[in-house]
Design a protein with these regions (language model features):
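Bacterial N-terminal signal peptides that target proteins for export
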Residues: 2-12
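Acidic/polar, low-complexity intrinsically disordered N-terminal segments immediately downstream
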Residues: 24-112, 270, 277-340
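C-terminal motif of bacterial Sec signal peptides marking the signal peptidase cleavage site
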Residues: 19-23
């Protein structure tokens, strides 16, 4: 079984060693509806993949996706490379199966269309910067996901055990978790994070020192009530990281993280990190039900069912996850796409 310790090291250690690989690099995730971001596509010159994007993701889920490199959409602060269409298709199929279809099946009707990703741009490489390398960012609400060209969907029949575990963790933690993290930002933009959530760790948010603060002191941010170092950047990132991480971890993996958090950050701290995290989670659950009629545990169970795997023997559900060739257009595409 994937251990929480391995998962924690997988997420946190590379961040520190590379001066922070982070999933959300913008100081503002707010959507400006009047800001023109995309130019209309010429449908007469679309590839099959572009038609799949428009007719499935665009029309069904109200999301605008671009994967062809456009310099005007790339950050001026980071070096970015283009995503290949083959890798973009693989990512789109992964996103469809582990994200949009999860909400479509168990969330309230219309939730995915109104409260998830609206604008998505894919780049092939990491966002290479002078002090940090990014997995993605969200400038002006336009979510950007990087490193698409290195996405691999593992299959035990084709990978040895160590290779399977490595690629599985990368797919889950670097790509799927990022989708849930970023979608959480759309929720708190509509309805602010509850004040009770903010007060729990209001004095411990580190802003731009979110990574170095814990590393230099040799302290686990879990004990301070943060699910990751990056969660300590701000209340908004705290909310999004908690949402995204809780959504993709199996219950036993979550419990192992809670055991690591079951200590006090400071000798005079009133609560352990576990107590703070469990209180934050309870507040989040209440917030989601009250404002969006969303039961995060129901959504999480469906997400887990689709993406769960065990170290020694992937489950039957995981084989369902990889039974379709994610490098190909889905069969439904050919029966639904309008004929030119």
């Amino acid at each position: 079984m994937l251990t929480a310790m391995k998962l924690f090291n997988k997420i946190i250690a590379p961040l520190l060693l590379s001066a922070a690989l982070v999933s959300c690099g913008s100081s503002s995730d707010e959507v400006d509806p009047k800001r023109p971001i995309f130019s209309p596509l010429d449908t007469t010159t679309m590839t099959d993949v572009q038609k799949y994007v428009q007719n499935y993701f665009g029309k069904k889920f109200n999301v605008d996706i671009r994967y062809n490199y456009e310099d005007r959409l790339a950050s001026n602060l980071y070096k970015l490379g283009p995503a290949s269409e083959a890798q973009a298709l693989k990512y789109l199929n992964l996103m469809r199966y582990t994200f949009f279809e999860v909400y479509e099946k168990v969330a309230p009707k219309g939730f995915a269309e109104r409260h998830t990703i609206k604008q998505l741009v894919l780049f092939g490489t990491l966002g290479y910067g002078p002090t940090q390398n990014l997995l993605g960012e969200a400038p002006f609400g336009m979510i950007q996901v990087y490193d698409i060209n290195r996405l691999t969907i593992p299959y035990l029949g084709g990978d040895d055990l160590s290779g399977f575990n490595y690629y599985y963790e990368r797919a889950r933690d670097n790509y799927i978790q990022t989708l849930y993290h970023e979608s959480a930002h759309t929720l708190h933009q509509d309805t602010p994070v509850p004040e009770a959530f903010l007060k729990l760790t209001i004095s411990d948010y580190q802003q731009d020192n979110a990574f170095s603060y814990w590393y230099v002191r040799g302290i686990s941010s879990l004990t301070a009530g943060f699910i990751s170092d990056y969660a300590s950047k701000s209340p908004e990132e705290d909310f999004a990281e908690l949402y995204g991480t809780y959504m993709v971890l199996l219950p036993e993996e979550w419990e192992q993280l809670m055991k690591k958090a079951d200590h006090k950050y400071k000798p005079d701290s009133r609560y352990t990190g576990r107590e703070i995290l469990e209180r934050k989670l309870a507040i989040m659950k209440e917030y989601l039900k009250a404002n969006y009629h969303l039961d995060i545990d129901v959504v999480r169970a469906e997400a887990n069912r689709r993406i769960c795997a065990k170290v020694n023997l992937p489950s039957a559900e995981y084989y369902k996850f990889v039974k379709d060739d994610f490098s190909m257009l889905p069969p439904s595409y050919y029966s639904t796409v309008p004929k030119d």
